[in-house]
A protein has these predicted regions:
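Long, contiguous binding/interaction regions
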Residues: 1-88, 96-196
């Protein structure tokens, strides 16, 4: 079995999307909720899959009124890498502070946090995030408020998750340390669907 990436044929035309958008958005809101985890008050992980990425691409094409093949292919090339490959989980990490001044200061103190997020399969070592591949996510002063993370699992971990063992998720940064052990069964089961 191979994880399918999106193609031009897996997307709807702008006209068709306009007709189904309201229904699809409602479905995606529920789907995304089942794949989201909050770590404390200020950090959220949104685990991606083909459906969440299809929604993002459809929305971008709609907003930009893109219908030419070249523009569609460009969006697919940008977003397909965010779909899990069958041996990993991929997520968008959001660092959220409502006050702009507080956010600026916190992003300074949280520099490097993207490398301190982990997933652990029960009975195994932590799997640390591989963050922002091919992207600059911080500068000398601060981290970014949005990061793209990948958690690469070995064959034994994948088999264990398919067998039904628990899973935990956390972050171990000196300025922000939170864990959920175990994560909800609903989240765990949704993420296991990403694995081959």
């Amino acid at each position: 079995m191979e994880i399918q990436k999106l193609t031009k044929n897996s997307l709807w035309t702008l006209e068709h999307y306009a007709r189904v958008r309201d229904k699809f958005r409602k479905e995606m809101i529920e789907h995304k909720k089942s794949r989201m985890v909050r770590l404390g008050e200020n950090l959220t992980l949104h685990f991606e899959d083909a459906q969440t990425i299809k929604y993002q691409v459809q929305e971008i094409l709609r907003i930009e009124k893109t219908f030419e093949e070249e523009g569609i292919v460009d969006e697919l090339e940008a977003y397909n890498p965010l779909i899990p490959d069958g041996t990993n989980f991929k997520c968008t990490m959001m660092i959220e502070f409502s006050d702009e001044a507080v956010r600026r200061e916190k992003l300074k103190s949280l520099k490097g946090i993207e490398d301190k997020v982990w997933v652990r399969v029960e009975g195994r070592d932590k799997v640390w995030a591989i963050a922002d591949e091919d992207l600059a996510s911080e500068n000398d002063e601060k981290t970014s408020a949005v990061h793209f993370l990948r958690f690469e699992l070995d064959e034994d971990m994948i088999k264990s998750l398919h067998y039904g063992v628990g899973m935990s998720i956390g972050v171990d940064h000196t300025q922000y340390s939170v864990s959920i052990d175990p994560v909800s069964l609903d989240l765990r089961n949704n993420l296991v669907k990403d694995l081959i």
